[in-house]
Structure formats: structure tokens, C-alpha cells
UniProtKB/Swiss-Prot annotation:
PANTHER family: ENDOGLUCANASE, PUTATIVE (AFU_ORTHOLOGUE AFUA_5G01830)-RELATED (PTHR31297:SF41), GLUCAN ENDO-1,6-BETA-GLUCOSIDASE B (PTHR31297). It comes from Acetivibrio thermocellus (Hungateiclostridium thermocellum). This is Endoglucanase C. CelC has an unusual substrate range and displays features common to cellobiohydrolases by being able to cleave the agluconic bond of aryl-beta-glucosides. Coiled coil: none annotated. The keyword Transmembrane does not apply. It is an enzyme of class 3 (hydrolase). One of its GO terms (molecular function) is beta-glucosidase activity. Belongs to the glycosyl hydrolase 5 (cellulase A) family. GO terms for cellular component: cell surface; extracellular region. This enzyme catalyzes the endohydrolysis of 1,4-beta-glucosidic linkages in cellulose, lichenin and cereal beta-D-glucans.
Amino acid sequence: MVSFKAGINLGGWISQYQVFSKEHFDTFITEKDIETIAEAGFDHVRLPFDYPIIESDDNVGEYKEDGLSYIDRCLEWCKKYNLGLVLDMHHAPGYRFQDFKTSTLFEDPNQQKRFVDIWRFLAKRYINEREHIAFELLNEVVEPDSTRWNKLMLEYIKAIREIDSTMWLYIGGNNYNSPDELKNLADIDDDYIVYNFHFYNPFFFTHQKAHWSESAMAYNRTVKYPGQYEGIEEFVKNNPKYSFMMELNNLKLNKELLRKDLKPAIEFREKKKCKLYCGEFGVIAIADLESRIKWHEDYISLLEEYDIGGAVWNYKKMDFEIYNEDRKPVSQELVNILARRKT
């Protein structure tokens, strides 16, 4: 069986695409990219997908072979190069993490049925591929609490287990897969569950000047790691709506801070005696490269220390790129760290 320790995300291909076109889907990721990933030393990829790739709102329950072919070919490439594949639904019927405020998934039984039916179909399709593929239920749930999420999650697990009793299922907590929310997940008696979290701490370093974050754009500072945030008092004084940022004043950005922020996940595992996986982590590409390398070095060392697998965000583009358009790494040192190659 393949390993799921050192992975990389394929965001932007069949999820979060800028244009829904055959040309994009045929060219954004090819076999050569999977070969590049394998040669670098990674052992798996995380493949986000959006449901419109495989199901149209006009033909519910009819699954599109042309869209499914992209998952199929990625799986075949992964098998060829001995990589694992985590199949992650990024955009579900009625839910997308970017638009969670307008979500209908958790209140609409029809959307919930569609959601579970898609996974039921995929479980049947890939029932003989469990040595290479794992399913991740849904990316970055944001709900007032975990009640409705737990209910849907248990329905999903029940549906999958009626088809396949040993497929690995990756389950994340509320609030963008926060480590702090793992403890609020429903108890699951299943030996083939992996608990998934995301890690982008400290946020105003990993997301500095991120164009999609109002607060990061407002702060608009270059942040180094290790280091400290600069000008917090002045910023809050001039922008009182961000008063919550005063807690960042004089905060030391270093490995011990990362360890502290990772602690809820470690404590959860100690209590549950379960497997952990970090489905996303990373630093925005506009950050200082030396700082970017050092953050990843520190974080990977913690994942190694605590024996946690994970997948960096992101292989290319998506503002967090590890490789450029020519499949050249932004830094070979960074790739070696991420692939957990000892140098």
C-alpha cells in the first residue's frame, strides 16, 4: 500500500478553476506533472474536485464520464508512479467554503441526498482502488457549531460503509478544518477513519497581503519568519474594526508558536487514539522565500515529530505555488523539505 505522509495539493485543476473548459482540464495537470511530483520524493497527491465536474444541476444523478475521466487518469498516473491519491470534494451541492454564508447544504435534504449519492457513486466506482485512493468528505466546513455537520458526516460514513468497509475516509472539523474543532466531531467507531485538519498559522504571515482576505489586505505588511508583526498598535489605532489583532502585538513567530497552535490536534489524537492528517498547509508565494523555507522546515519537523502525514498547498498557481509553469521548483531546498527528503 502507498504512503500518505508527504503530499502536495493539485488545487486549481478540477476545483477552483478560473474557466470551465476542456482545454484547461486537459492541460493544467498532465502525466508529466505527476511524474515530476513522484521524482521529487512526494508519496501522494490531494486532488480537490468540484461537483459540477461530474454532475450537472440540470441532470441530478447522472454522472458525467468526461469529468470523471480526469479523476480516473490522475489515479492511473498515481498508480504508475506509486503515489497515493486523496480525493477531496471542495465544492459540494449547496456548499462551497468561499461562499459558506449562502450555503444551503446543511438545511436542504435534497442537497444532502445529492451530496451523499455522489460519494456513494464514487465508492462503487473505486471500490477496487482502495490501496491507492482515499476519500475526503468535504473541504473546510464553516458552521455556527458542529451539530449539522456531524449529522451529515455520519450519514455519509454509513452510506460508504454499506458499499466498502475498508476505504480510508478523511474527516475534518468545523471552522475551515481547524485543529481546535476536532474535539467537537461526533464519536465514530471505525478503524478506517483519518481525522483531517488544515494549518495556516500564523495567519498574517502565511496569508500576508492575500488579495481575498480583507484583514490581510488592510494590514498589508511584509512579515518575516521567524520574527514579529510590526506596527500592530498603530494599525489597530487607525483601524479599530481589527481590534482583535492587538493580541498579536509582540507575538513571537517561531517554531514554538507553531507547536502551540498544533497542540489541540495532538491532544485530540492522544485522547482518541486515532490517525491524523494535515490536508493543507503552506505560505503564500509573495512572502520572502527565506521565511517561506524556514516556516515549512519548522512545520514539517513538527509533523515528523508527531508522525502526521500531510499535503502542502499548492503544486502550482493558486497564490501558494511550489512549482512554476515549467514544472521547475521555486526552491529545490523547499521541495526537499516538503518531500521529507533528508539532505
